[in-house]
UniProtKB/Swiss-Prot annotation:
Protein name, per record: COMPASS component SWD2
Other comment: Present with 704 molecules/cell in log phase SD medium.
SUBUNIT field: Component of the Set1C/COMPASS complex which consists of SET1(2), BRE2(2), SPP1(2), SDC1(1), SHG1(1), SWD1(1), SWD2(1), and SWD3(1). Component of the cleavage and polyadenylation factor (CPF) complex, which is composed of PTI1, SYC1, SSU72, GLC7, MPE1, REF2, PFS2, PTA1, YSH1/BRR5, SWD2, CFT2/YDH1, YTH1, CFT1/YHH1, FIP1 and PAP1. Component of the APT complex, which is a subcomplex of CPF, and is composed of PTI1, SYC1, SSU72, GLC7, REF2, PTA1 and SWD2.
WD repeats: 25-64, 111-150, 152-191, 199-238, 246-287, 298-328
Family (UniProt): Belongs to the WD repeat SWD2 family.
Lineage top rank: taxon: Eukaryota
């Protein structure tokens, strides 16, 4: 697996190389995608209460992990390649801490009273955030089964850590606000509130800081995404030019993502194509259309979720199938 410079010509050279069909008959759409820190493995969760583990570097399926008793969503690696946490979709809505090699649970994180819609691991330590339909966002430590901090929230939030692990963002789609919090001063509330002045911007499904710490992406499934200055909160760009996805009952982990250098955004399209936006060379406060598209796998495939490998020149899309794209000269 190679690593190449990220630019428009190279992004257009990414090609689809592998497609994985569901392993079970009662298959359902993939609801989350996550790479480990080293970019060697990919973990997905599906609406049929299973998780799938892949070798990202070899584009190879490795294993299915069943969670039929509890259901699963938002499966993410900890900082150990053989461990993950994921949210339950039934029973008691505990967050599970699982060893992927032994299939043994290491800990249950109890407290949420409704579905957990989002989980994010702190990039520099073993704490993580969860957002739930029980009107709370919670901060946890992998070593302790009870939450460290509970933040009241009237609606399920999108959540994201900045690269330093010192700041996190909570996105509230009901009041069109994003709050930025200092982890050391959570109880003081957000130190910056970003207002989104677009009442049509709905169906949020992603918050993501760029790896260079400069930008904050707010993704949606309506064919539009927004980029903000991560320091000032100023809206910089509106990304358009893709078709909206129809509403569905299942969650997903976001239809847009930054490239690892933070200079481009890739987004999925209901047409099946992958859109490329270049915001780094653009004048701020502009509406941007895609500079190009990576061809779709087939006209029958409409991937909702997308994730770029943090270390290697490859990305993955998913919905009914999991599709690997790699750089190809």
């Amino acid at each position: 697996m190679t690593t190449v410079s990220i630019n428009k010509p190279n992004l257009l050279k990414f090609k689809h190389v592998k497609s994985f069909q569901p392993q079970e008959k009662d298959c359902g759409p993939v609801t989350s995608l996550n790479f480990d820190d080293n970019g060697q493995f990919l973990l997905t969760s599906s609406s049929n209460d299973t998780m799938q583990l892949y070798s990202a570097t070899n584009c190879k399926f490795l294993d299915t992990i069943a969670s039929k008793k509890y259901g699963c969503h938002s499966a993410i690696f900890t900082h150990a390649q053989n461990e993950c946490i994921y949210s339950s979709t039934m029973k008691n809505f505990d967050i599970k801490y699982l060893n992927l090699e032994t299939n043994q649970y290491l800990r249950y994180f109890s407290g949420h009273g409704a579905l957990v819609n989002d989980l994010k691991m702190n990039p520099v330590n073993d704490t993580f955030l969860s957002s739930s339909y029980d009107e709370s966002v919670r901060l946890w430590d992998l070593k302790i089964s009870k939450p460290q901090v509970i933040i009241p929230s009237l609606v399920p939030n999108c959540i994201a850590y900045d690269p330093s692990g010192l700041v996190f963002a909570l996105g509230n789609p009901e009041n069109f606000e994003i709050g930025l919090y200092n982890l050391k001063k959570i109880q003081e509330g957000p130190f910056l509130i970003i207002k989104i002045n677009d009442a049509t911007f709905s169906q949020w499904n992603k918050l993501e800081f760029s790896n260079n710490g400069k930008y904050l992406l707010v993704g949606s499934s309506i064919g539009k995404h927004l980029i903000f200055d991560a320091f000032t909160g100023q809206q910089l760009f509106e990304l358009i030019g893709t078709r909206a996805f129809p509403m569905r009952e299942f969650l997903d982990s976001g239809s847009a993502c930054f490239t690892p250098d933070g200079e481009f955004v890739l987004g999925t399209d209901y047409d099946g194509r992958i859109a490329i936006w270049n915001h780094s060379d653009s004048i701020s406060n502009k509406v941007l259309r895609p500079q190009g598209f990576i061809p779709c796998v087939s006209h029958e495939t409409c991937p909702r979720s997308i994730a770029f490998n943090p270390k290697y020149s490859m990305f993955v899309t998913a919905d009914e199938t999991v599709d690997f794209y790699v750089y190809d000269e």
